[in-house]
Amino acid sequence: MFKINDVEWNILYVNPNSECLMRSDGTITLGVTDWSKRTVYLSNALSGSLLEKVLSHELVHCASFSYDCHIPINVEEIVADFLSLYGKEVVGI
């Protein structure tokens, strides 16, 4: 469990074919953030740098929900991808 802006979140590792990893368009992905359950679902097949990237991406969604940001989903996805790739470098400056 972790908190962002006093909102408690959980991380669950699930089977790569789990319904929990299904996107709204019906495709399966590697990670999903579920606001209603305050849970990040990650494929248990992830490891190493890919796990770090997917988790970082999902944490952006957690922060967006926790701070009640209303960002269009296509923009939020771009921000999440950017931070998952370059966030450590930006923060480390």
Regions found by a protein language model. Name each.
Residues 53-65:
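Active-site recognition of the HExxH zinc-binding catalytic motif
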Residues 90-93:
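Short helix/loop segments within enzyme catalytic domains
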Residues 1-51, 65-66, 72-81, 85:
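Active-site scaffold of zinc-dependent metalloenzymes
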